[in-house]
Amino acid sequence: MKKSIYINGLGSISSQKTYDNTHFLNEVIHYNNTVLPAVSPNYKDYIVPSKARRMANGVKMGITAAKIALKNANHPTINAIITGTGMGCIIDTEKFVGSIIDNDEQYLTPTPFIQSTHNTVGGQIAIDINCKGYNFTYVQASNSFESALLDASLQLELNEAETILVGGIDELSDHSIKIHKKINHIKNAATASNQLLNSTTKGAIFGEGANFFVLSNKRQDSTYAKLLGTSMHNTLKKEHLNEVLIAFLSAHNLTLENLDSVVLGYNGDVEFDSFYNTFTSLLKAHTGILYYKHLIGEYHTASAFALYTASQLIRHQQTPEDIIKRKSLKTKQSIILLYNQYRGEHHSFTLLKSCE
């Protein structure tokens, strides 16, 4: 018999004030820009200041989001830490490469190099919470977080671990922003975030953030939802969305009729949001349609925020108006499906269910 997997705690650092788990999007920040920086908590509350000074923003976000998740789950013993990231600690990478050029490859400071690897966040979290177990980082572009989620799910189902910390983390950097603007992946003109669905231009608004989750095969008082499964597709044509969706739901003994809401990764790119329009055309009339990237921007592990959103919705049964594209006709949100893709590639489906 397949073991159940529960989301027992979560922590989020994003372009909204999500670091406070006492409420969920009660005060939404609206932006008019092309890049949305994360709203940081007081890092002194989570990281020793002498250590924080030497950390890049992405590392601080990751450690803090992880600690918030652990506190939210009542500080369980963690058997493994699995992270996903698209660009890793890119700020330190840029610092090190810049110093190579500026100093003619001599007298280099090693710190940026040591902290520039993609697994820096996972390693720093392990040191901080004294976890000596399995520690792995996935770098699979916009499927990075889902790869980490799938790994954790398999380990829990096979009893290789009892409680796992899983997260997605990506940070903004000046150089990467310039490159994405140059190739039109970021919009050329400032866009009002609350009007993103009406965008008629190419490119997205970009962001950064860290979202961590405590997964376990044991339910507890802090449990948010049950994770039924996740599926990834590197490439997927629009005309095949229907059969892939039906097959994914069928694998979990569900149909389109069972979906109470879907959480979609609309990012305002007129060229690729059509995937979501095709997807929504398949849904039943009672199924709610929700979106979130107008709140946090686009980045490789932005889909982790979708899991955070769906988990909050299932536990608290309250849907903030700012994320509703079409209101659900169901009185209770029991089954929620997440669908994300980036520029027509790296498609992912994740399914959550209430614990009742």
Question: Model-found features: residue ranges?
Answer:
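Conserved "HGTGT" condensation-loop signature of ketosynthase/thiolase-family condensing enzymes
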Residues: M1-F136, E146-L150, L154-L158, G167-E356
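Catalytic nucleophile serine of serine hydrolases
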Residues: A141-S144
